[in-house]
UniProtKB/Swiss-Prot annotation:
This protein's name: Large ribosomal subunit protein bL27
Annotated region (Disordered), positions in chain: 1-25
Species of origin: Lawsonia intracellularis
InterPro entries: Ribosomal_bL27
Claim: rRNA processing is one of the keywords in the record: no
Family indicated by similarity: Belongs to the bacterial ribosomal protein bL27 family.
Length: 88
């Protein structure tokens, strides 16, 4: 005779950690060349002046400067863009 009743198995007992996406540097902040500005899936935010885009759509600063975000419309659709204003 078994002294313990057989326990049921759980099918939902796992979870994956978050991927830490999002905006890393906000408007008005000073950045150095190479700093990551945004980690994203696809082009939610497009690269503007002095901003580069990596293979995984990560936006990064190409020069030292100050971050500015901008929204603009094209064919009745709203887009966001990030620029770096260079500092001397």
């Amino acid at each position: 005779m078994a002294h313990k009743k057989a326990g049921g198995s759980s099918r939902n007992g796992r979870d994956s950690p978050g991927q830490r996406r999002g905006i890393k540097r906000f408007g008005g902040q000073k950045v150095l060349a190479g700093n990551i500005l945004v980690r994203q899936l696809g082009t939610k935010i497009h690269p503007g002046e002095n901003v580069g885009m990596g293979r995984d759509y990560t936006l990064f600063a190409k020069v030292n400067g100050i971050v500015t975000y901008e929204t603009y419309f094209r064919k009745c659709k709203r887009y966001s863009r990030v620029h770096i204003q260079p500092t001397v």
